[in-house]
Each structure stands twice: as structure tokens, then as C-alpha cells.
């Protein structure tokens, strides 16, 4: 059992919505661990735009063809969930120094609750440093073109949720002049 535990990581979040920053981190986590569970949180102090089922379904669509990556909803304490799933690693992403303080506190609390569950931090790829689910929702709600910042299925769902038609008004599109090195969206 202990040999298997280090090969499985849990990457938790609300994923409301899933962004390309999340996708990048999950893929990179999969390069380190044999399996990564994308654990979609049911219990959140935030009021999600998408239901738990919608968030799980969108993530499942994104990772459908990715071996070793599964998506599951979870509720309750993250460390309890990780333990139930046989994982002793929680994978977390850091965008900036401002993320570190909060993530550090969470990691220490999780360690206090379950000493054998470790938190592993990965730095976000530089091209995703500025995005968050909150910023994505704010831009999308005002008609901003967030294409390429979220997977295509999430992009479509955001457009539907906010009632914006296709195709987008080119005047609302984000500039992509400096984004030539960004990978295409899924």
C-alpha cells in the first residue's frame, strides 16, 4: 500500500470554471505522479456559477483522453478524502507570492490534521500567472473574449451561461499579439 501512495496525488479545487492554468498544472502533476485525481469541491464558501455536476462534467470532458487523470467530486475535509482515496499527496499550484501565505496556512493545517498527507506545490507556468477563475468569470460576464484562457468546452459553457451569442464580437476579443507562445486551448 505505501508503495502505491506516493504515486497518487489529489489536486483539489472548485474549478468554477476550470482554466488553462488548472489544466497545465494537472498535466504537469501527471508527469510527476502515476495518477492525479482532480477533486472538485462540493463544499465551498463561494457561490459557484456552475453546479457541482456541471463542474465535474466539464473537467471530465477536458481529461477524457488523458490516461492517469480522473475527476471526482468530494465533500468534507480534503485530507480525509485524500486518505480515503489512498493518496498521501495534495497537489497545489502557486501563481504569485500572494498565493503562498494562504496555501502555506492550508498546508500546515492539513499536516496537523493528517501528518502523513503532504502538500506539494508547483509553480504556475508564466503564461497563466495572471488568470484565476474569478478573473475569467468577471471578463466573461462583461462580454470579454476569454478564448484560449479556458478549455473550449468551458468557453462555450461560459458564453451560454452569460448569454453571449456566437461568434463573438471581434471588438470584445482580448489582444493576442503577445500571446503567440501560448498553447492552443483544448
From Swiss-Prot:
It comes from the Bacteria. Its EC number is 2.7.7.3. ATP binds at residues 14-15, 22, 93-95, 103, 128-134. One of its GO terms (biological process) is coenzyme A biosynthetic process. Pathway: Cofactor biosynthesis; coenzyme A biosynthesis; CoA from (R)-pantothenate: step 4/5. Keywords: ATP-binding, Coenzyme A biosynthesis, Cytoplasm, Magnesium, Nucleotide-binding, Nucleotidyltransferase, Transferase. One of its GO terms (molecular function) is pantetheine-phosphate adenylyltransferase activity. The keyword Cytoplasm applies. It catalyses: (R)-4'-phosphopantetheine + ATP + H(+) = 3'-dephospho-CoA + diphosphate. The keyword tRNA-binding does not apply. The record marks 22 as: Transition state stabilizer. Pfam families: CTP_transf_like. It is an enzyme of class 2 (transferase). Homohexamer. This is Phosphopantetheine adenylyltransferase. It comes from Nitratidesulfovibrio vulgaris (strain ATCC 29579 / DSM 644 / CCUG 34227 / NCIMB 8303 / VKM B-1760 / Hildenborough). The lineage of its organism: Bacteria, Pseudomonadati, Thermodesulfobacteriota, Desulfovibrionia, Desulfovibrionales.
Amino acid at each position: 500500500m505505501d508503495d502505491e501512495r506516493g504515486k497518487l496525488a489529489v489536486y483539489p479545487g472548485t474549478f468554477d470554471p476550470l482554466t488553462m492554468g488548472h489544466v497545465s498544472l494537472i498535466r504537469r502533476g501527471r508527469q510527476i505522479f502515476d495518477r492525479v485525481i482532480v477533486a472538485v469541491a462540493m463544499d465551498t464558501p463561494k457561490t459557484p456559477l456552475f453546479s457541482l455536476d456541471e463542474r465535474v462534467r466539464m473537467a471530465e470532458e477536458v481529461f477524457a483522453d488523458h490516461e492517469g487523470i480522473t475527476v471526482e467530486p468530494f465533500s468534507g475535509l480534503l485530507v480525509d478524502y485524500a486518505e480515503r482515496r489512498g493518496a498521501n499527496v495534495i497537489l497545489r499550484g502557486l501563481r504569485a507570492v500572494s498565493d503562498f501565505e494562504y496555501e502555506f496556512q492550508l498546508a500546515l493545517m492539513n499536516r496537523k490534521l493528517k501528518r502523513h498527507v503532504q502538500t506539494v506545490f508547483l509553480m504556475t507556468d508564466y503564461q497563466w500567472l495572471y488568470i484565476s477563475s474569478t478573473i475569467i468569470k468577471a471578463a466573461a460576464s462583461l462580454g470579454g473574449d476569454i478564448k484560449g484562457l479556458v478549455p473550449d468546452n468551458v468557453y462555450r459553457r461560459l458564453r451560454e451561461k452569460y448569454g453571449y451569442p456566437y461568434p463573438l464580437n471581434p471588438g470584445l476579443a482580448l489582444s493576442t499579439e503577445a500571446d503567440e507562445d501560448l498553447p492552443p486551448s483544448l
